[in-house]
Regions:
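Alpha-helical transmembrane segments of multi-pass membrane transport proteins
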Residues: 1-234
Length: 239
């Protein structure tokens, strides 16, 4: 009976438009306060005891928060501008730049959905404007977004390392080469398809634009350098 009431509360909140996270949280709190003998204090204590020895998992919510800040704070736009300046002049340049931007953002966010949302919302619209098909643009970003869990730092790697008691740093190092190879192979494939289909390419913007866009994206690129040189622990890095 209690379980049925809990499900009814969640579904009712979802039907009136309450966000999923808030629906789950409020229904659980209401259930604990009214229908359960367990106190909220004991739940907090149990959670703390479960986290003991697995402090690396604290990096996960910080990665999610950091990716949200970078998506809304303009870091994604600066990375896209830098990517277009570097590779946008090749055949299929905007698509290749989208993959390159996904690789850079993946090295910051550690999440595939965050990478797709941050880069895809900008790049797909740009690709459609210059003549790419909707299917091709969506396919490129969908494939490039998967690099978010392969190129370190990765949330999946943090969870696996914590569950198996292996080094997070070693997990990150193990994902560098496969992630780079996957990204490069995807860019080469786009280049070949662009040559065969005569897809649009951008103009060479010059070294001044590369340096100018790099200066704007410097803090995002600096965070990548910090993560890959292991100057801090994973949790400290994302903070």
């Amino acid at each position: 009976m209690e379980v049925a009431i809990l499900f009814i509360l969640v579904i009712a909140m979802l039907m009136i438009g309450v966000p999923i996270a808030i629906s789950l949280g409020l229904s659980s709190i209401f259930f604990l306060l009214t229908l359960s003998d367990t106190s909220l204090a004991s739940i907090a204590q149990s959670f703390f005891q479960a986290m003991a020895g697995h402090y690396t998992l604290l990096a996960i919510p910080f990665f999610i928060l950091a990716s949200s800040f970078m998506s809304t704070g303009g870091v994604a736009k600066r990375i896209i501008r830098f990517s277009i300046a570097v590779v946008g002049h090749f055949p299929g340049g905007l698509a290749i730049a989208g993959v390159f931007a996904c690789m850079l953002f993946a090295a910051l966010s550690g999440s595939s959905p965050a990478t797709v949302v941050a880069i895809g919302t900008i790049v797909i619209a740009g690709m459609r404007q210059v003549g790419y098909s909707k299917e091709f643009a969506a396919g490129v970003i969908a494939n490039a977004g998967t690099l978010g869990i392969l190129i370190p730092p990765s949330i999946v790697m943090v969870v696996y390392a914590s569950a198996t008691d292996v080094s997070v740093g070693r997990m990150f190092l193990a994902g560098v080469i496969p992630g780079l190879l996957a990204g490069i192979m995807l860019m080469v494939t786009i280049y070949i398809i662009a040559k065969m289909r005569n897809l649009p390419k951008g103009d060479w913007l010059g070294w001044n634009e590369i340096f100018a866009s790099a200066r704007e994206a410097v803090w995002g690129l600096f965070l990548i350098a910090v993560s890959y040189t292991h100057l801090t622990l994973p949790t400290n890095t994302v903070v």
